[in-house]
Amino acid sequence: NIIKKTMDFLSYLFKLNSITVNYHNSSNSSLEIYLNEIVQVFINLAKNSSDAMIEKNIENRFINISTYEKNDSLFIEFEDNAGGIKDLVISKIFDPYFSTKSNKNGTGLGLYMSKTIIEEHSGGKINVYNTDFGTKFVIKLPLK
């Protein structure tokens, strides 16, 4: 499972920053995707969540990841409790060179590349929403 492997790869980052990752998988289907590209998407999302939690000094940090199937698609939901993205800029976060990071550690390319990988290389869709706790990314990928 690529999500589990990616989260294992990032376990040091999560441990270092006291982030609990909850993962619920309701799918056993396989996808025809570029594995390394999808792994990069999950790394981008996890790193952004971690950075936001640190910058906003969030306590009891968590990332919830769930997968499920619906209508011949695999859905991956990636949610954090980092307080969300300001309404003024949420529509711009997939734009190239756009970054919300105040410390200038962001290039503004991570989410742009993630959207390109999901939508142009994998035939899927990625959307972002604010929740009561933070931000939720929903990725939809076609099942083979």
Predicted features and spans:
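Core catalytic ATP-binding domain of two-component histidine kinases
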Residues: 1-144
